[in-house]
Amino acid sequence: MGQSVRNQSTIGYIRETATKFLDRETAGGIFLIIATIVALLLANSQWAGAYHHFLGDELLFEFSEHLSFGLTIEEWINDGLMAIFFLVAGLELKREVMVGELSSIKKASAPLLAALGGMAVPALIFISLNLGTENIKGWGIPMATDIAYSLGIIGLLGKNVPRQLKTFLIALAIADDIGAILVIALFYSNELSWIYLGSGMGAFGLLLLMNWTGVKNLIWYIIIGIILWYCFLNSGIHPTIAGVLFAITIPIVPKLDSKILKERTATNVTNLEKTELEKLNPLQDKKQQIILKAIKTDTENSRPPLLKLENSLVDFNAFFIIPIFAVANAGVKLDVNLIEVVSGSLGLGILLGLAIGKVTGIGIFTLIGQKLGVSELHITLNWKHIIGIGMIAGIGFTMSLFITNLAFNDQELIKISKISILIASLLAAIGGAVILLLTSNKGRKNIVK
């Protein structure tokens, strides 16, 4: 008996601890770090061949004898799952723009200006070091911010980071990634499929029309959203942008407003009380079942579709998509002399561009926006926050790796670029995290004048 009670107590403690862990903001960041370490170990072990072979295997869906669709596992992760990641980030960003921290033009323009500076300065640093060499083709490499890793580090810091700063980073990183996607489309893509691109924009237009005409059923949005993603996948433009476009179209106004909900709920509760006074069995009384179902339906219809979709995806995003993404992309082989890598113009351009250029550009353009009066930051944010988030934005990683593969054919240049990206991203993550941990006084007034 006593042993049984102790066992139940132990199980209860373990369950409670696990629940608290999964509820913590840091859990997603911890999963991300573990996944990154696993990927690096696999890529530098005897299983490296099997690891890369697995990612290159095709996952095919056959709908009929003449209709099938397949991508490699790596493509499903980077082009498919990451589109969902961008959807979640886009939903959060839209919510903040509509009713949150970015609801004013000045507050919304601050991260956009920061993103512009965070792209321009790293590119200029790289160009200045590589002008006149074949390495110049890699000028777009240090421009990118890896939104998944950046948000993962912010999540790892938990409540030491103000919520407003996370919102700022999301807006900055999405703008940065859209900029990187445009750079890829304009300067690194061999050709665009205008038919698919036009079809994708048509799907986007249809989604906007659905929103405008008051369609609230998420099923229809998801169906058209999948078509939107497929069109961009085949257009020559990175399909993750489809996630952002899809998020823009999701309605934020609920099907049932609060006034009508209040009236209906009051009526339903009154009717329910009448059935209870008659002492009817709820399992046998169909009237009670109908009333309870009506209350449930009305409550569900009072929730904005945007929040429904965001809440349904947030845990899947944090505990599955981001770790899987890390396992698939962090596997860089460390088989070169690190000193030689970062001392050459290519490696140095990437290293300085990401680790120094990002924070410099973000800081300068934020200051310009403040001085010109075109942007403003939340009162809880100060210069240390901007420097810290600017450094974390220097985590280029996957988008930088993607541009590397487009910019160079020489395997030696690709290897140097990848190692430099990894080192720069690591320095940026550590530097930014340390600064933000030292600046965890959320209540300080804004000193960005």
From Swiss-Prot:
The chain crosses the membrane at residues 30-50, 69-89, 112-132, 138-158, 168-188, 192-212, 218-238, 241-261, 312-332, 348-368, 386-406, 419-439. It comes from Christiangramia forsetii (strain DSM 17595 / CGMCC 1.15422 / KT0803) (Gramella forsetii). The keyword Lyase does not apply. The keyword Hydrolase does not apply. This is Na(+)/H(+) antiporter NhaA. Keywords: Antiport, Cell inner membrane, Cell membrane, Ion transport, Membrane, Sodium, Sodium transport, Transmembrane, Transmembrane helix, Transport. It catalyses: Na(+)(in) + 2 H(+)(out) = Na(+)(out) + 2 H(+)(in). GO terms for biological process: regulation of pH. Na(+)/H(+) antiporter that extrudes sodium in exchange for external protons. Pfam families: Na_H_antiport_1. GO terms for cellular component: plasma membrane. It is found in: Cell inner membrane. It is a multi-pass membrane protein. Belongs to the NhaA Na(+)/H(+) (TC 2.A.33) antiporter family. GO terms for molecular function: sodium:proton antiporter activity.
